[in-house]
Amino acid sequence: MKQFISRCAQLVAVSHLIATLCLAAPTPVAPTPVAPIATLDREGAWVSIDGYGPNIIRITIAADRNEARTGPGYGILSEHLDNTAFKHVSSANGDSFVSAALSLHVNPAPAPHVPSAGEKYFAPQLAPVELQIKNAAGQTILTMNDWSMAPQTINGEKTYQVGATFAAPADEHYYGMGQNQESTGALDLRGRTIDCAHWYEAPAGEQVCVPFMVSSKSYGIVWDNASATRFIAGINGRTAFQSKVGERVSFFVIVADNIDAIYSGYARLTGKTPIPPKAAFGLIQSKARYDSQDALLEVAKTYQRKQYPLDVMVLDWFYWTRMGQMDINPAEFPDPDAMNKQLHDMGLKSIVSIWPRFETASRYFNELDSKGYLLKDKDGKSVDGLPFRFDRTGGLIDPTNPQARAWFWDHARDNILSHGFDYPWLDETEPDLVPDGFFYSIGSADRYHNLFPLLHVEGVANGMRVWRPEQRGLILSRAAYLGSQRTGALFWSSDINPSWEALSRQIPTGLNMTASGIAYWGNDIGGWQSLPQTSSALKAPLIDPTGASDVVGQNNDYPELFTRWFEYGTFLPTLRVHGDRKHTELWAFGPAAETILADYDKLRYRLIPYLYSSAKATFDSGAPFMRALWMDFPNDPQVSDLGTEYMFGRAFLVAPVTEQGQVQKDVYLPSGTSWTNYWTNEKYTGGKWITVAAPIQQIPLFVRDGSIVPIGSAIQSTATKQLITEIRVYPGKDGEFLLYDDDGTSMDYAHNKGTTTTLLRWNDATQSLTAVSDGRAPALAITKLIKIIK
């Protein structure tokens, strides 16, 4: 049963809270003052309204007026507050806030009533607040009919559990809310309860909380609370957010007439998604771990000898002498500067793993402890993770402390990155050591449960920008929060199992993560965890495992699994091979697998002009280019819950094979267009399921009518200038494609310098393709490049 408190009790509790807040923790940062359009009194509930442009509105509800008028929390770019688009009209029927894009109506306070028997026996309920939001067409798209503040004591702090409840029409579907790996195919969150809280050990795979929900009704809700949050999606006619800690309900509603405009609004609120260095779109080679400088270099050289494209080599953990020593073991890596120079001479980049934990015996622990730069317990002592689990030994850096962030960056730069490494990999950004029950510098870690990845990664990202201001940054990160996309990080689904089931979970997981505004997501190709002793294959493997026994042992179907996973990875925003096994390279799984893997590696590189142009579109719009089908086909009811296939850019429909021994697959082709099988050029009308052949060397892949796909020349890495060798046109509809390029490494693109764009337009009636250049480079001569697929 809900807990409720009266207005008087609320105010007493809030006053007590202000007097005693965080006795065991440092004083929280003072809130940033804001100027709402209005702050409404609803008989004990204060409601503040702020605009962030014409299609974004913030609603804040609290029992204390000052809380209701406090600025937004972490992750939100409050400088984009802009109330000028809204007109406020107050009447006996309530208060309305109207712009060209939306209207918000807050109902008037209810008439006084005689308390019920229940209200006399239990605590009186909060003053009700009800509101409705309509779109520009006057359609009601969102109704909030309840809110809650339940008093509690968390971590010694008197506070509240807060929440809001919304009507859930039967035809509404919900997406986003970060990374949840529980589904093997269903995409719609409706009917599910999502615990939006970072959790490395979630049974199906790591959970990551990005509290941004997008509705099929063409609006999004950004839930402004960093504590652990439960999202109840369309159960018993209601949708609700319930956060563990807070003094207010605060959320943003973004309204638009198309999906991409919602993501533009999200980018306005939380930051644009930068274009990564071009190397990020190539193959990233990693394993746990390369145990010497020679071993890492030999892998890079083998890629070169075999002429398999490669862009990045990764040095994973335990290259150090001790966790938190922040050094490079000279016995294994005697000259990291020379190692990185050799990689650079081969046209490659390097990534190095840097962890946020410090063993008590490491050289920096005492310094960090004395300065208060680590996560603390209620007595103010630095927390050692060793009692919780052997591999969590040490204290955790506190990224909420600006001085601790600066210290971490300075030492990561000077001790590690300065040895020629290009980019950092920030592992354990949930973090592994669950912070609940402990304290950050800004207060109870329960209050800020989901905040670590944003502040930790942003601290390093900002440091990289200052250190190398002309160079585009790149960071690998295992978790995210509101605004994490602005750090330029590439995210992945953590330490997943090397199994067919885990592979099937990746597709809906990734689609809801990109729907959460995190465009650059991937996974460990092949799974991270160690292989089981024996195979569980029920069918004869489609890949001959001969030559792979030293890697796969008796898991004879693993070369098949790795091949299918790599085929899928070819059509992910980032393609990164990783895993806790002897070898992970393309030649490690036998000659039969190697041939197919090399072909897909080369295909990925031929598609980089298409990929990179899609990345520019994401930078401009905020919308992801790995897209669930509902984004591009909102009027097709068949795709609302379809999480086994997706769009990769605007042209490709990808349907990965996720079952062992499978040689054909049922694929749904959305309505409203026709489709071409990429491999056979066979055409299909949309709006139906088909069964398509899926031999081991073919991932089911279709191209939408009207698509224009630029194909690049064969290159060994993106360090080589890539030419356009072909422009494929899939007729049947008019179409256009904005071909984009830049130097691939600098920040010039962000200032509209050093870029080239060519608008390619297909006229289906005349069967002609035209190219309009921006004039910054010689016009693309397209006549000899055009290939019409019929």
Residue ranges and their predicted role:
Residues 9-20:
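Bacterial N-terminal signal peptides
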Residues 22-24:
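Boundary at the C-terminal end of the N-terminal hydrophobic targeting segment
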Residues 42, 87-280, 287-289, 293, ...:
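Catalytic and substrate-binding clefts that recognize carbohydrates or anionic sugar/phosphate headgroups
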Residues 64, 73-75, 143, 159, ...:
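Aromatic- and carboxylate-enriched substrate-binding clefts and catalytic-loop regions
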Residues 129, 462-473, 480-492, 513-523, ...:
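Catalytic core of carbohydrate-active enzymes
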Residues 47-49, 59-61, 97-104, 131, ...:
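Short, well-ordered beta-strand segments enriched in hydrophobic/aromatic residues
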Residues 49, 101, 212, 303, ...:
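Conserved, mostly hydrophobic/aromatic
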